[in-house]
From Swiss-Prot:
Chief location bin: membrane
Membrane topology note: Multi-pass membrane protein
Protein name as annotated: UPF0316 protein lin1888
InterPro entries xref list: DUF2179, DUF5698, UPF0316
A Pfam family: DUF2179
Length: 174
């Protein structure tokens, strides 16, 4: 293999590794996994120095710079895909039903979720408001289950910053 092609390929692959680790490390930091984030940053910096030195030592070849830039973009995509798979943390899902249905909270509880419900008033009458805490990795599954039960439900999710007490207390502790 030609040395120039080998350097371009190496820069590309090493930068994908660097940015993937960077993306995951950033998400670990935001989720509060400080020691795991610190450990990953060590590997991130080693890989970064290798990739950057390869580019800086070979700046006369535009393909090296392009490999670095494209590897950066691909690394972000790969890092985000990994984060979606591990889906760290929890989400709070708020549901406003189309109609007031006393059985709905129990149907969702039967699926294994903790549910708090209360009467709400909408423009067109009484609604039920539900608040559900679940792991992020279950978010899509929960959305599908809610829509199967109430196709007209309004669903909004957000990430809680702190959790204390309630249905999940034993499972949420880090």
């Amino acid at each position: 293999m030609d040395n120039g092609i080998f350097i371009v390929a190496t820069i590309f692959v090493v930068n994908i590794l660097y940015v993937t680790i960077y993306t995951v490390r950033l998400l670990l930091t935001m989720k509060g996994y400080r020691y795991l984030a610190a450990l990953s940053s060590v590997f991130e910096m080693i890989i970064y120095v290798v990739a950057l030195s390869l580019v800086l030592d070979n700046l006369n070849n535009i393909a090296n710079v392009l490999a670095y830039a494209v590897g950066f973009g691909v690394g972000i995509i790969v890092g985000m895909k990994i984060e979606e798979r591990i889906a760290l943390g929890y989400i709070t899902v708020n549901v406003i039903t189309k109609e007031y249905n006393l059985d709905l909270p129990n149907q969702i509880r039967d699926l294994g979720y903790g549910v708090t419900s209360w009467l709400a008033s909408g423009r067109d009458g009484e609604r039920m408001m539900l608040e559900i805490l679940t792991q992020r990795k279950n978010e899509r599954k929960l959305y599908k289950q809610i829509i199967e039960i109430d196709n007209g439900a309004f669903i909004v999710s957000s990430e809680p910053k702190q959790i204390h007490g309630g249905f999940w207390i034993k499972q949420v502790r880090k």
